[in-house]
Amino acid sequence: MKIFTSNQIHELDQYTIEHEPIRSIDLMERAAKTLARAISDMWTVETPMVTFAGPGNNGGDALAVSRLLAEQGYQITVYLFNIYQKLSDDCATNKQRIIESKRVKQFTEVTQEFDPPKLDSNTVVIDGLFGSGLNKPLSGGFASLVKYINQSAAKVVSIDMPSGLMTEDNTYNIRANIIKAHTTLTLQQKKLSFLFPENQQFIGKLKVLDIRLSAEGTEKIKAQYSIIEENDIRPLLMTRDPFAHKGTMGSALVVAGSFGMAGAAVMAAKACYRAGAGKVTVHTPRKNNEIVQISVPEAIVNLDHEETYIGTAIDTEDFDAMAIGPGIGQVETTAIAMISQVRRATCPVVADADALNIISNHRAWMQQLPKGIILTPHPKEFDRMNGSPCADSYERLSKARTMAEHLEAYIILKGLFSALCMPNGSVFFNQTGNAGMATAGSGDVLTGIITGLLARGYSQGDACKLGMYLHGLAGDIAAKELGEESMMATDLIKYLPKAFERLKD
């Protein structure tokens, strides 16, 4: 699913109007019917409703929705804010229609200060003040109204966007002036700002409504951002040759674990095997030998000459993919071995955890990373790589995109909607996964899965997309059977086979 910017949303609307063809007012009516149906599914006609409509097309949507609901018997009080005596054409048309219908309980056009109505816990507020076209923080009377609504006990349903929230960049927005919706009914596609954790408090329950915008237009408009869906993933899956053997299924190297952190090596290696690798070699300190041999008997163990930390780089000519970083620590000897290992790699590399922290501590080494390397930071790890904290998720994503292009790397910003930043500037969001995965070791498992897929022969981009999706899907299956509260990272490995099978069904 493509994610469009506010300008592209307008472009798609215009494409639909021109090529369907359909008048813009009729397209608004079609959207309003879909919105009204969704609202009537949530609340009965006995529910009192208050609509706050702005002067633009979002307000036009709200007026049309209110009229349609009133025609069904809902008792709706409508306020249209026309402070500057300038309505969009379609908003003006819907103002006239709502007046002529005489079905709403009360219609008030606000042209100056007004006393807001009482909003109690039985009331539903239809928020249609501002939508995807908003490009600056709310201020003045609109900001005061938003605060009044937020402080009330009413349930709020926002049309397309919670008023005050911008479609992409909210770095310098005033968060106190954004509607906190109970439900957001967004039109056609999710918006970029919906995928950032700091904005979840405004969105509430999200429903995406299909208003039948042009499929041809959607295909033609090039989007920088996309959400990975199951239909995108299924075609990527390789089949196993019935004549395959371990030598043809890919050989992976996992450089992981200092003494006391052998679990990171174990989880990455197990996940690597579960992702389909034919052979997995674990390079780890000597004191981890027994733990790794017992925990992953399938693995080949290559012991470092150091007892408790990794101090040497090994040859990678016999490997098809390499993971480095989980649990290796950050002592200087390990740091030197790590960058040497990465520089001399002859296969695709996945760098995670301490490998990323080492790079952050030796920023000049960043330019020595091989093209096509996969970096998998969580937010704090990325901020350290960036050299300074990011103000919010949008800024972090923007900087990660720039870094991925500059380094010609693949960067996965981990989180609820993990974002894969590609070397060409495009970004793919993963929508599988849940809060039960917020536990130590989940990142080691992701590293192992991606490395196993690389060893199998997937390209870096496909391995990242498939790896993120499978990782989250395994978590979703585990949560359904175990509950989020009690999940551990090893459960992701346990349920990875079921995730594969789900995709093959």
Show which residues each predicted segment covers.
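Short acidic loop-to-helix transition motifs that present clustered carboxylates
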Residues: Q112-F114, M161-T167, L192, E307-Y309, ...
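Internal gly/pro-rich beta-alpha loop/helix module
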Residues: N122-V124, L129-A223
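Short acidic-hydrophobic sequence patches enriched in Asp/Glu that either
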Residues: L87-D90, G141, A176-I179, M488-D491
